[in-house]
Curated annotation (Swiss-Prot):
Family, as annotated: Belongs to the universal ribosomal protein uL1 family.
The protein's role, per its UniProt record: Binds directly to 23S rRNA. The L1 stalk is quite mobile in the ribosome, and is involved in E site tRNA release. Protein L1 is also a translational repressor protein, it controls the translation of the L11 operon by binding to its mRNA.
GO cellular component: cytosolic large ribosomal subunit
Keywords linked to the UniProt accession: Repressor, Ribonucleoprotein, Ribosomal protein, RNA-binding, rRNA-binding, Translation regulation, tRNA-binding
Molecular function, one GO term: tRNA binding
Naturally occurring in which organism (per UniProt): Nitrobacter hamburgensis (strain DSM 10229 / NCIMB 13809 / X14)
TM spans (from-to): none
Repeat among keywords: no
Protein name: Large ribosomal subunit protein uL1
Xref: SUPFAM superfamilies: Ribosomal protein L1
GO biological process: regulation of translation; translation
One Pfam entry name: Ribosomal_L1
Assembly behavior: Part of the 50S ribosomal subunit.
Entry-linked PROSITE patterns: RIBOSOMAL_L1
Encoding gene, per UniProt annotation: rplA
Amino acid sequence: MAIGKRLKKAREGIDREKLYPIAEAIKLIKDRATSKFDETIEIAMNLGVDPRHADQMVRGVVTLPNGTGRTLRVGVFARGAKAEEAKAAGADVVGAEDLVETVQGGTIAFDRCIATPDMMPLVGRLGKVLGPRGMMPNPKIGTVTMDVAGAVKGAKGGSVEFRVEKAGIVQAGIGKASFSEEKLVENVKALADAVAKAKPAGAKGTYIQRIAVSSSMGPGVKVEPGTVLG
């Protein structure tokens, strides 16, 4: 079946103007996630911020109670004992100058990047490569840290980084279609709570304006914010 026809069929039974309770919304998208692969369930939150202003930036990290269903590759910039700690914790790639050269050469063999503070002058050279991908280590979200073992285990255990995009939207994967409805709802609420707590000082008016959930190949379903927050 062509993608267009599949999506049209999936939209049947969904009121595109209605705000659904989160449990009902999750059921609707799970029922329509019929691809041969285990589709990712995603959330999109429209925020009342303008990220062009520094005091309206929203960024953070949250460990989802039921994980993401995805195995992240973790890269760590560290030397000596900290490099050994990272390896023991399960980091996929660990290095210093050698890892910088690898990344500069166009090979990024990781999805999450962690660094010890002393490595940041070196890692800073990769700003143009890692920055646009949202992978630059940042102390505010715990990816610049001396506790590299804890950061690696957190990344491997289901932590999700979130960051508001230019249009004022936060998007993130919160699990797989194979997850139970209850686990997906718990993950949605955990992420939404973290975004709510990350409300910047410069935000004015309604902070979380709209919420929608979808699967990788399915239609979006609008969610009643009150069933997610609080």
